[in-house]
C-alpha cells in the first residue's frame, strides 16, 4: 500500500539504515485528493498506537517496521501523537519542517556562527508550542546519522536525522524529550562502518568513563552577578593576582574531591583571605582521563560532571563573582585526544583533525591537531570559547600550548612537516584562527581577558590585531620562570656566576604584556614541588620560598601561583589526591602562608605594583650589578605619582649584612612596608632597623639599611622635589 506513494529505493534505504532524508518518507504524506497517510517507521515493533484527534487508532503494519494510518485530508502535526515503545506519548518527529535555516548554514560554513552553541548539539526548545529537543550535528561524510538513547532503546534505525545542508548538517526535532535525556550519535560512514559517537557540541556528559551525552538547558540557571559583569573591565591597570586551581585536588572530603557547590564557598573565602583577585581553573571541559588534568578534551562545551552538573558549575562561578573573585578557564584549542568515541574521525573521515602532516599525531602528546583551514572546525572552536563566556560567565580564557599552534615544525623532525606557502614554519591558518578568536572575544565580551601560553619570541603576541599582533591581553613569561628557577637552584655561594639569570628577563619585560607564572607545569613529572627546587636546610628553604614569592610580586607583570605553592606543599602535585592542608599545622608552612597573604594584600592595594606595569616607565633599576652580595634593587613607579615609589631590594645570599649602602639619589623619606625575614613570617627578624638617609652637603645620595639573608625588603620612598 505505501509502495504506491513512496519510492521503493527510498524505502530500501530507510530500512537498511542509509536514508539521508527520512522526512520525505515519514510523517504526514499526501495520498490522494481526499486523504492523507501518516507513515511511521518502528523497526522491531509489532504494533503502533496513534492518538488521532483524541481517539486511539492502531496503525497498519506493512513490512520491516513500516506502519501507516489513513487520516483526513489536511491532517496537521498537532492532530496526532504517537505512543512510543518506551511508553512516551508525543508528537511525530517527522512531521516538522527543517529548523536549521539558510542563515545558519551560511554563517556556519563561513566560520562565523558565533551563537553556534544555541543551534548545534541537543537544544531543548519549543516548536509551534510543542516542547522537545532539537538534535543537530555536522557529519558531511556520513551516509546516515541517527540519535540514540533510552527513548528508542539505543536503536539507530528508529530516529535517523535529516540532512539539511549540502555541507553535511543533520537535524531532527524529537517532541517529548526533556533535559537530562541521555543520547549519542550513531553514524554510518561512507564505507558503511557504524560509529557510536558522543556529541561534539554536548553541554553535559555522564561521569567518565561512561561518555554519554546529556541534554542540558544552559539557560535555566538564574544568575545574580549582574553588578560584577557590568563592572569587570580590562585589567591592564588593575591588580591581577591569579590562584591556579585543579578542582579535583584542591580539597577532598570523605575520600573524594569537593564538588562545584561545596567548593564555591570554601574557595571564594580562601581567595579573599589570601587577597587573590582571580582563580584560574585547569581545564574543566569534559575529559575522559583524569591523568590528563583536563588537557585532553572530548567535551568542549561541557564542564566535567565529576564535580557536579553544569548548573552546579554556574553556581560556582556566580558565587565567586559575588565575593569579588574572577574566574579564568584554561582552554585547549590546539589538539584533541584520539578516543574513538569523540572527535577523532568523527564521521569515518578526518573531520576535525588536520591531515597536513605525514604523521597525524602530535609527537608530544600523541593527539590530533585541529584543522584551522576548515571553517566549520574554526566555528566549533570559536563557539566553544564564546559559550563559556556567554553561558558560564567566565572572565578570561588562557589558551594552552599556543606555541604548538603557531609553528608547523613544533615537536616534529625534518621531513615530518611541510612549510607554509611562503616556505616558512609558521602555521598561517592557526595564526589567523588566534586573531579571529581574540577579535571576537573582545568584541562580544569587553573586559574578558585572553592569555597565551607561548614559550618562544614569536612577535606581537599581545599587540592589537590592527597593529599586526595576535591580540592577546597577556602572554605567560615562561622565560622569566625558567631563568628564576635556574638561578634559585644554584647554591648561594655560586650565584655570583649566574647573576644574568636574575636580571636578563627585565631587558625584554616590556616587549609584551606579561604574566609571571609559577604554574602547575613546574611541580609535576619529577620536577618536584617549589619547596624541593630550592637549596639549603629547612629554614633556608622557607626563606627561599618567601624570597621567590615576594620577588614575583615585585617584578613587572601580572601574577599566577599554582595551588599549594602559597604554603609550600612538600611533595609534588598529583591530580589524584588533595593538597596537604595539614601542613598548615606546621609553623614553617603557616608563617609562609601568612607572608603570602600579606604580600598579596600589598600588591592589591599599592598601584605601584600594577599600574602601567607593562610599560618601561613603571620600572627603574637602582643596582643590578652587585654580584658580590647577590643583591638587586629597583623602583616600581606609578604613572599617577611621580613623587613616590616603591623601593624593592632582593638579597639572594645566605649571609646577614648589618649595614648595606644603596646608592639612590633624592630620597627624603624611606618607610619599610614589607620584610620577608620578619619573625611573624618565619624569618630571623633581621632587616627591621630604620633606614638611614645618606646626605652630603644637603644632598641625599643613598640609604643605609640592614639586609637580612635570603630576603626581600619593600620600602615606600618619597623623593625631594
UniProtKB/Swiss-Prot annotation:
HAMAP family: GlgB (MF_00685). GO terms for molecular function: 1,4-alpha-glucan branching enzyme activity; cation binding; hydrolase activity, hydrolyzing O-glycosyl compounds. Its EC number is 2.4.1.18. Coiled coil: none annotated. GO terms for cellular component: cytosol. The active site is at residues 400, 453. This is 1,4-alpha-glucan branching enzyme GlgB.
Amino acid at each position: 500500500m505505501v509502495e504506491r506513494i513512496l519510492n521503493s529505493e527510498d524505502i530500501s534505504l530507510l530500512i537498511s539504515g542509509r536514508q539521508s532524508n527520512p522526512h520525505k518518507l515519514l510523517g504526514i504524506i499526501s495520498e490522494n485528493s481526499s486523504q492523507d497517510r501518516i507513515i511511521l517507521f518502528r523497526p522491531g515493533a509489532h504494533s503502533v498506537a496513534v492518538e488521532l484527534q483524541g481517539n486511539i487508532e492502531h496503525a497498519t503494519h506493512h513490512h520491516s517496521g513500516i506502519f501507516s494510518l489513513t487520516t483526513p485530508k489536511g491532517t496537521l502535526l498537532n492532530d496526532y501523537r504517537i505512543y512510543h515503545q518506551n511508553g512516551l506519548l508525543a508528537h511525530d518527529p517527522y512531521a516538522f519542517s527543517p529548523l536549521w535555516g539558510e542563515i545558519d548554514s551560511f554563517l556556519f560554513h563561513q566560520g562565523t556562527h558565533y551563537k553556534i552553541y544555541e543551534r548545534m548539539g541537543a537544544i531543548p526548545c519549543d516548536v509551534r508550542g510543542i516542547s522537545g529537543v532539537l538534535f543537530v550535528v555536522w557529519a558531511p561524510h556520513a551516509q546516515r546519522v541517527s540519535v540514540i538513547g533510552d527513548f528508542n532503546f539505543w536503536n539507530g534505525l528508529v530516529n535517523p536525522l535529516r540532512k539539511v545542508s549540502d555541507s553535511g548538517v543533520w537535524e531532527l526535532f524529537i517532541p517529548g524529550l526533556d533535559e537530562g535525556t541521555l543520547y549519542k550519535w550513531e553514524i554510518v560512514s561512507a564505507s558503511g562502518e557504524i560509529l557510536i559517537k558522543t556529541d561534539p557540541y554536548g553541554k553535559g556528559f555522564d561521569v567518565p568513563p561512561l561518555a554519554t551525552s546529556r541534554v542540558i538547558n544552559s539557560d535555566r540557571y538564574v544568575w545574580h552577578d549582574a553588578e560584577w559583569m557590568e563592572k569587570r573591565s580590562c585589567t591592564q591597570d588593575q591588580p591581577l593576582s591569579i590562584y591556579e586551581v585543579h578542582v579535583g585536588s584542591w580539597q577532598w572530603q570523605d575520600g573524594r574531591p569537593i564538588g562545584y557547590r561545596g567548593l564555591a564557598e570554601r574557595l571564594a573565602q580562601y581567595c579573599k583571605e589570601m587577597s587573590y583577585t582571580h582563580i584560574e581553573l585547569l581545564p574543566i571541559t569534559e575529559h575522559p582521563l583524569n591523568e590528563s588534568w583536563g588537557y585532553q578534551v572530548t567535551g568542549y562545551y561541557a564542564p566535567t560532571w565529576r564535580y557536579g552538573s553544569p548548573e552546579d558549575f554556574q553556581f560556582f562561578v556566580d558565587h565567586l563573582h559575588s565575593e569579588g573573585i574572577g574566574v579564568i578557564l584554561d582552554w585547549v584549542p590546539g589538539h584533541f585526544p584520539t578516543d574513538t568515541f569523540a572527535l577523532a574521525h568523527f564521521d569515518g573521515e578526518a573531520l576535525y583533525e588536520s591531515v597536513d602532516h605525514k604523521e597525524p599525531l602530535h609527537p608530544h602528546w600523541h593527539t590530533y591537531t585541529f584543522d584551522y583551514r576548515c571553517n566549520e572546525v574554526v566555528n566549533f572552536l570559536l563557539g566553544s570559547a564564546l559559550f563559556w563566556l556567554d553561558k558560564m560567565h567566565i572572565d578570561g580564557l588562557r589558551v594552552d600550548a599556543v606555541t604548538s599552534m603557531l609553528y608547523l615544525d613544533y615537536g616534529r623532525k625534518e621531513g615530518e612537516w611541510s612549510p607554509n606557502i611562503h616556505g616558512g614554519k609558521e602555521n598561517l591558518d592557526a595564526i589567523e584562527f588566534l586573531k579571529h578568536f581574540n577579535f571576537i572575544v573582545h568584541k562580544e565580551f569587553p573586559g574578558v581577558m585572553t592569555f597565551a601560553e607561548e614559550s618562544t619570541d614569536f612577535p606581537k603576541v599581545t599587540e592589537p590585531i590592527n597593529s599586526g599582533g595576535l591580540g592577546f591581553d597577556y602572554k605567560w613569561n615562561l622565560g622569566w620562570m625558567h631563568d628564576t628557577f635556574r638561578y634559585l637552584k644554584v647554591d648561594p655561594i655560586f650565584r655570583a656566576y649566574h647573576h644574568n639569570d636574575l636580571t636578563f628577563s627585565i631587558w625584554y619585560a616590556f616587549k609584551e604584556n606579561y604574566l609571571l607564572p609559577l604554574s602547575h607545569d613546574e611541580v609535576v613529572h619529577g620536577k618536584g614541588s617549589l619547596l624541593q627546587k630550592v637549596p639549603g636546610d629547612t629554614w633556608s628553604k622557607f626563606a627561599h620560598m618567601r624570597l621567590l614569592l615576594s620577588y614575583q610580586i615585585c617584578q613587572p607583570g601580572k601574577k599566577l601561583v599554582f595551588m599549594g605553592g602559597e604554603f609550600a606543599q612538600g611533595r609534588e602535585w598529583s591530580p589524584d589526591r588533595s593538597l596537604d592542608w595539614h601542613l598548615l599545622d606546621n609553623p614553617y608552612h603557616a608563617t609562609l602562608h601568612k607572608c603570602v597573604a600579606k604580600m598579596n594584600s600589598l600588591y592589591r592595594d599599592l598601584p605601584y605594583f600594577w599600574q602601567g606595569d607593562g610599560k618601561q616607565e613603571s620600572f627603574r633599576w637602582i643596582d643590578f650589578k652587585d654580584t658580590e652580595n647577590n643583591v638587586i634593587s629597583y623602583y616600581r613607579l606609578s604613572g599617577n605619582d611621580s613623587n613616590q615609589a616603591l623601593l624593592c631590594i632582593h638579597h639572594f645570599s645566605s649571609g646577614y649584612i648589618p649595614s648595606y649602602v644603596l646608592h639612590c639619589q633624592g630620597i627624603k623619606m624611606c618607610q619599610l612596608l614589607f620584610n620577608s625575614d620578619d619573625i611573624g613570617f618565619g624569618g630571623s627578624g633581621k632587616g627591621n632597623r630604620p633606614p638611614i638617609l645618606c646626605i652630603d652637603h644637603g644632598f641625599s645620595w643613598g640609604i643605609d639599611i640592614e639586609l637580612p639573608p635570603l630576603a626581600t625588603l619593600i620600602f615606600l620612598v618619597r623623593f625631594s622635589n
